[in-house]
């Protein structure tokens, strides 16, 4: 699922979805040239860590894909979710993305590429049981 849009500093993306019982759920903010400006990927007992081969468990992986290559991942460990409902918000501030899950600030992520080229927001469940409930842009960013 996706929405096409124009997006700039100070605006927010909100995705509401049921969390996966296993697997992955991701929200991508994508530029018109295909650059993934922000990739937020929640993994609940999914895949395997390169260092151990054991599954990722309750981790949020944040990254960007520039020029066809993924950058260095930033990770937030021990991310608690509920099966029934999750609310992800990625807000653009002046210099960083502010990432919330269930109304809790869990990470900031520095811009790696200009954000005014964003034209699309994508939601993916990687074939797992997460279900998108709502995907929208909020103008302007909600005050905290």
Swiss-Prot record:
SMART domains referenced in this protein's UniProt entry, alphabetically: GLECT
- Its transmembrane ranges are none
Any one GO molecular-function label of the UniProt entry: carbohydrate binding
For this UniProt record, give its keywords in alphabetical order, as a comma-separated list.
Lectin
What SUPFAM superfamilies has UniProt attached to this entry?
Concanavalin A-like lectins/glucanases (SSF49899)
Per UniProt, residues of the Galectin domain are: 1-138
Its quaternary organisation is: Tetramer.
Known role: Lectin that binds beta-galactoside and a wide array of complex carbohydrates.
Protein name (database record): Galectin a
Species per Swiss-Prot/TrEMBL record: Aplysina lactuca
